[in-house]
Design a protein with these regions (language model features):
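PRPP-associated nucleotide enzymes
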Residues: 1-367
Length: 367
């Protein structure tokens, strides 16, 4: 397929779902990788019903090996796979039982002991932080499960596996899970420090051939800004410091305005799993709900990406943030969910969608 900046060729070798039901494709402003695989079941760039997100995570959890020794530590990659990782973690624990813990990488600094840092080579914001999980003896972990939305070369997960494994002296196996895996046979698994396997809903190969003349890449200044880490002074632990399967997560006592049945729940950056749970609750109550989330990733309109909103980062960095495929004209009432202090969400986003901002750190929510 021609994406303007180049041609993307795909070869599907195994599929548990049709390609079009899982993802589309777009072009992004990133000199490191000019194309974007846009998931239709992730709840990030494309609006999706929370029930569909849950089913995709359940299918991915079921595709994992059934004999992973526990305790299992699942790690979701920020920002895109935080919600997916935590949902797969919960679904795998529900399906297989046993002791299971979750942790996600972050680009936010908090006042907590750092476990490790690693790099995501093709990202516009390459640095990831992993904090030491609370209440977990790392020496007991026997399986490390790494979750990302897609695998292209496997380099990111190989870097992550190597960074974490040195802190897990009892580690026996590493497993990777992704919605789509384009690594073409998984040779990257051989570089893992323990025996490793990969599971996905679609497996195949891709080849990117850049065009000779492409639109100008972002300025060097943008790349420097995009790599900045944020800082959270008052931290809501929804996964940065770990959580155990089945642990309750308190949600705001929220009710939509009277007469509003069509809703859009928007997570912000890495803060996506609690908003997803809120969306599930609203869907169970009979509302027509879709989930989306803001992103640092600059994407050009076209392909699977239509409308684009640009606004400031609610985490206080100078990194531009975006929300795609969301328009006030669709008639949905928008709830922008955030863990950052009240007033931190850019009014430009709120006004563009006629939205309300919902803080998840107030009374009735666990800090």
């Amino acid at each position: 397929m021609d994406l303007g900046a180049g041609t993307l060729s795909l070869e599907i070798e195994r599929a548990l779902r049709p390609l079009d039901s899982l993802c589309g494709f777009a072009r992004r402003r990133n000199p490191r990788r000019a194309f974007l695989i846009v998931s239709r079941v992730l709840g990030r760039h494309i609006p999706v019903r929370p029930s569909e997100m849950r089913v995709a995570a359940r299918d991915l959890a079921a595709a994992l090996p059934s004999d992973l020794p526990g305790p299992v530590l699942t790690v979701g990659l920020a920002e895109t796979a935080v919600c997916l990782g935590q949902t797969v973690h919960e679904e795998r624990a529900r399906l297989r039982g046993g002791e299971s813990h979750f942790l996600h990488s972050t680009r936010q600094e908090i006042d907590a002991p750092l476990l490790c840092r690693f790099e995501e080579p093709h990202s516009h914001a390459s640095a990831h932080l992993i904090y030491r999980p609370e209440g977990l003896d790392l020496a007991r972990v026997r399986t490390l499960l790494l979750v990302d939305d897609e695998i292209s070369t496997g380099t990111t997960l190989a870097n992550l596996g190597a960074a974490i494994a040195r802190h897990l002296p009892g580690l026996e196996r590493i497993a990777a899970a992704s919605l789509t895996d384009w690594s073409g046979g998984g040779a990257w698994l051989d570089s893992m420090p323990r025996p490793a396997s990969a599971s996905s809903l679609i497996e195949g190969r891709l080849e990117w051939r850049p065009a000779k003349a492409t639109e100008a890449a972002p300025a060097t200044g943008f790349a420097a800004v995009a790599g900045r880490l944020g800082r959270i002074e008052r931290h809501w632990n929804s996964g940065r410091l770990g959580s155990q399967a089945g642990a309750p997560i308190a949600l705001p006592a929220y009710s939509p305005p009277a007469g509003q049945r069509r809703l859009r729940v928007v997570g912000t950056g890495e803060f996506t799993y609690p908003p997803f749970l809120l969306a599930e609750r609203l869907e169970r109550e009979g509302h027509d709900v879709v989930v989306q989330a803001t992103s640092r990733s600059p994407v050009l309109p076209g392909g699977a990406v239509g409308a684009a909103l640009r606004f400031s980062d609610n985490y206080g960095t100078d990194v531009p943030n975006f929300l795609y495929n969301a328009e006030a004209a669709d008639g949905r009432h928008t709830i922008v969910c955030h863990e950052t202090p009240p007033g931190s969400v850019d009014p430009a986003l709120v006004e563009a969608l006629g939205a309300e901002a919902l803080f998840f750190g107030g009374p009735g929510c666990a800090p």
